[in-house]
Curated annotation (Swiss-Prot):
InterPro entries registered for this protein in UniProt: ABC_perm_TupB-like, MetI-like, MetI-like_sf
Null mutant phenotype: Mutation within HVO_1886 or HVO_1887 causes nitrate respiration deficiency.
Domain of life: Archaea
Pfam families: BPD_transp_1
PROSITE patterns linked: ABC_TM1
GO biological process, one term: transmembrane transport
Subunit structure: The complex is composed of two ATP-binding proteins (HVO_1886), two transmembrane proteins (HVO_1887) and a solute-binding protein (HVO_1888).
Family affiliation: Belongs to the binding-protein-dependent transport system permease family.
Protein name: Probable anion ABC transporter permease protein HVO_1887
Length: 232
């Protein structure tokens, strides 16, 4: 029924590999930036905290094409980062996906951090724990929620099409290997060609990846303390 047999195996493996590479790199970068933000915001009460959390939540709804356009302008030859010549490269795609995945990761991990009981933090402080000790304790207690945040961000990144199409250029070489074409942009190409069955086949692969990520996320959500009476 589906036209997977019509696809070059090299092409199929290549676009899947690019999708996984770009999404994984974007989530890793988002984690490096986002987890410290989640801990900093979750640990402290400060003036304007509600505004910060509102901005983070709003960021989850960033239109991907707008993000792609902004990154395009920044990386273009006349843009501030034009000298690095990153436009239409996997690195440009990673940057755009990081911008989209970061608010998701921060928002979900912040909720996990804030769900750790204050009494637990106070007890650790009373026992002589340093700020680092308390931070590590909170991370350990919120670990399932943090993993859920990582998986949610990954699902956001790997299903992205608008921004990666703008900044990546959807480039594939003559030997059928992909440079910046992903599963999502390949589906767009096949749909425009009228190859609906091939597009559906690629969509099935993408859907399987997303469902796998969501299944892992659901598993960790169920193991988060306070949910369904289960926890550690």
């Amino acid at each position: 029924m589906f036209a997977l047999g019509d696809l070059n195996l090299t092409y199929l493996v290549s676009i899947t590999a690019v999708s996984l590479y770009v999404s994984t790199a974007a989530v890793a970068l988002s984690a490096a930036l986002g987890l410290p933000i989640s801990l900093a915001v979750g640990f402290r009460d400060f003036y304007g905290k509600s505004v910060v959390t509102s901005v983070i939540s709003t960021g989850m709804g960033f239109p991907s094409v707008v993000v792609g356009l902004v990154v395009l302008l920044v990386l273009s030859r006349s843009g501030p980062l034009g000298t690095f010549e990153l436009l239409f490269t996997p690195e440009a795609m990673i940057l755009s996906q990081t911008i989209l995945a970061l608010p998701v990761l921060v928002s979900v991990s912040l909720s996990a951090v804030q769900s750790v009981p204050q009494d637990l933090r106070d007890a650790a402080f009373a026992a002589g724990g340093t700020s680092t000790d308390i931070a590590l304790l909170v991370v350990r207690e919120a670990r399932y929620g943090i993993v859920t945040a990582l998986l949610a961000a990954y699902g956001r990144a790997i299903s992205e099409v608008g921004s990666v199409l703008i900044v990546g250029g959807n480039i594939v070489f003559s030997d059928s290997t992909s440079f910046t074409r992903t599963l999502t942009t390949a589906i767009t190409v096949e749909a425009r060609k009228g190859n609906i069955e091939t597009g559906i086949a690629l969509g099935a692969i993408l859907l399987a990846l997303v469902l796998g990520v969501n299944a892992l996320g659901a598993r960790f959500r169920d193991r988060t303390p306070g949910r369904n009476g289960r926890g550690r």
